[in-house]
Amino acid sequence: MSGPPPPYEEQSSHLYGQPASSQDGNAFIPEDFKYSTVVISCEPIIRQRFMHKVYSLLSCQLLASLSFCYWASVSTSLQNFIMSHIALFYICMVVSLVSCIWLAVSPRPEDYEASVPEPLLTGSSEEPAQEQRRLPWYVLSSYKQKLTLLSIFTLSEAYCLSLVTLAYDKDTVLSALLITTIVVVGVSLTALSERFENVLNSATSIYYWLNWGLWIMIGMGLTALLFGWNTHSSKFNLLYGWLGAILFTAYLFIDTQLIFRKVYPDEEVRCAMMLYLDIVNLFLSILRILANSNDDN
């Protein structure tokens, strides 16, 4: 008589030619979920760990930015360095923009490989097959690459933020930071609640109008810069600040919903960057509002 059948886990691992648990950075993600299933369709433990990774990365980004800004506010030598090397500020702006776009638009390796015809992925020898599977340079194929690019983006943003916050007094900056924290916590908890799941049905149309609002803000800023509008006017700054505060609060709400319901489990770095941008822009808008309110008083 034959012995009892092997356990399901052992049999599955032999069928797929790999152990049941992996040692890589995404070990908690089963292979069938990792590449083709959005987060909302995964098991609860996977959703929880994905949320933990996103907010851990986001917390590190915000802590690094806050620490650098605080260092700049208390260190006279760092203030002198920042003020005497304005060119470095513009370099950091360019680096931040490039790394942000790269993280945002870089295709997933699985999407790129899926677009390659099947005959090209099989060869007569192992070495040609490996050559054919080689991804383009702009595809971030490993977690380490994504994390490195996110670190470069965060450090560049932190340097730019330090120069901006030096232009305001400490009380105004702290007030803006407190208000931003309250708004972010409130919006995030609201967006993650089940009662607002139906908002996703109209997320595409909402994003359309949000993007229009963003382009209006960009147009206002460029017009003021090129044609000499009085950007120091309290009315202009208040209008610009309130428009930005409303716009990026809506962005934060929609992005939080989309991130935990419409993305894949291996996109935590991109998600953290999106939330970080929403929070930073919201903070800058609130800072502008408070600064001009103080000037009027």
Curated annotation (Swiss-Prot):
Membrane topology: Multi-pass membrane protein
Cytoplasmic topological domain: 75-85, 168-171, 230-239, 292-297
Presence of keyword Transmembrane: yes
UniProt GO MF annotations: calcium channel activity
Alphabetical keyword list: Apoptosis, Endoplasmic reticulum, Membrane, Mitochondrion, Transmembrane, Transmembrane helix, Vacuole
GO CC entries: endoplasmic reticulum; endoplasmic reticulum membrane; fungal-type vacuole; membrane; mitochondrial membrane; mitochondrion; vacuolar membrane
General function of this protein: Links the unfolded protein response and programmed cell death and mediates mitochondrial-dependent apoptosis. Induces cell death and disruption of the mitochondrial transmembrane potential via the mitochondrial phosphate carrier MIR1. Dispensible for starvation-induced autophagy.
UniProt-recorded name of the protein: Bax inhibitor 1
Organism expressing this protein natively: Saccharomyces cerevisiae (strain ATCC 204508 / S288c)
Record gene name: BXI1
